[in-house]
Amino acid sequence: MNYLHLLMLFETIFVIGSFYALKKDILAPSFLAGCSFWLSALCVLLNESKWNVHLLKKTLLILVFGQIAMFLGDILATKVPVLRKKDKETIEKEKSMEYKPIFIQNGKNLFLFTFNTALFVYFAYSILKKGFYMNAIIDAHRMQVEDGISEMNVFVQQSFRFLIVCALVYAFILLYNRIICNKKYQHDMFYSLYFNALAIIESVLSASRRNIIVMLIAWFFMTVVLWNVKNGWQFKLSKKLIRKTGVIVVITMVIFRALHTILKGTQSNLTSFYDYVTYYIGCPIQSLNIYLQRNVQIHRSPYWGQFSLPSLMKALKRIPRSVETTFDYVYLGGGANAASNVYTFFLAPYLDFGFMGCMIFSFVVYFVLSLLYTKAVKNRNMTYSVARNTAILGFIYWITLNSFYFCPVMFVFAPTGLISVICFWILFVFLFRIRFN
């Protein structure tokens, strides 16, 4: 029996079923995760002969039941009642709410412009002080661990996170004025693009593509939420949005392909764009499969959360700093001549908590994500608190579309993730001293 074909069949049924079960909400966490797994399974199927793929029954069961657990957590969260009900006066007030454009005082814009520019220059200097050559950037990549650029100055590390927060908050302002108020302001465009460009350049200089993915998914999330608000949460998936999303995905993959060539060289046969895209998207499932082939008897991690929540556990001193919390590379097999060290969302909790623990972990993560989305953002008018929630949730929503790749929870539920959320709160207070409604 070909378990890979069964996986592809399951992914197709799962995507269609979750789409309708979750009322055609394209932002439903388990639906987005299902789409990413469907695409990953397709890329493995396209390379079945080349990679000599023989999917294990165990791999199939982990992927199938893991996604079912995600879906159950998602759909259960939609059934949780709202704890604080609105009175009639509040409901009527929100129905008649008139949205006005957001204007940020020039002094605040200039302060953040100067502050972030100065920190960016210092960051770039820290990377390139040995000379402007690619080895300096590669060295920066080697300095990274699961929690970021750990060996750099602490102030430099946190400034990077604050810059990303600024980039996303100004992206929200740009999208809000454009979508909700149908207004185009040059200063919105300038500051939003400037802060986002700085954040992307810093990501490239630190040899990390992760933050670029975080920002792109946040832009996508905020755009869809604002379109829903404008249309009374009666949003329908349009061909225009699909086309734009497709173009952005292609451009992103081209950029990632270029970064892969620059930073990792060309010691593989991933010479074509097609090979790279199918490798990048499909390798996690094959890596998981190979890991399970080589490790028939799985022994649970000696430390709770060693692989799924390493940064948090180390910060709480539940895991010694010297304990290894990352995975080694494995070759994909066959004629791939390529390696991977990403194993989908499920391997980390599987090693930490066993099969049932992995299912519970997946259920809880997607229950929390869905609860935050459905209760703090969905079907709400764009008040100050909802705007803040949208920006923060956009920042962590990359968990959904990256679940096919690895376990992003380790980065979100980490000290740096908490610092970033605090930065969102501080920046919203700084920019919007009074609520806009």
Model-found features: residue ranges?
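Hydrophobic alpha-helical segments
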Residues: 341-437
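Alpha-helical transmembrane segments of integral membrane proteins, especially early/N-terminal helices
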Residues: 19-37, 73, 114-130, 174-183, ...
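Membrane-embedded catalytic interface detector for glycan/lipid assembly enzymes
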Residues: 79-236, 252-262
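Membrane-helix boundary/interface segments in integral membrane proteins
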Residues: 12-21, 201-205, 367-377
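Small-residue-enriched transmembrane helix-hairpin modules in multi-pass membrane proteins
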Residues: 140-156, 247-369
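Hydrophobic alpha-helical transmembrane segments
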Residues: 2-16, 52-56, 104-111, 157-173, 188-199, 351-372, ...
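N-terminal "leader" segments that precede or initiate the main folded domain
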Residues: 1-102, 106, 189-199, 215-259, ...
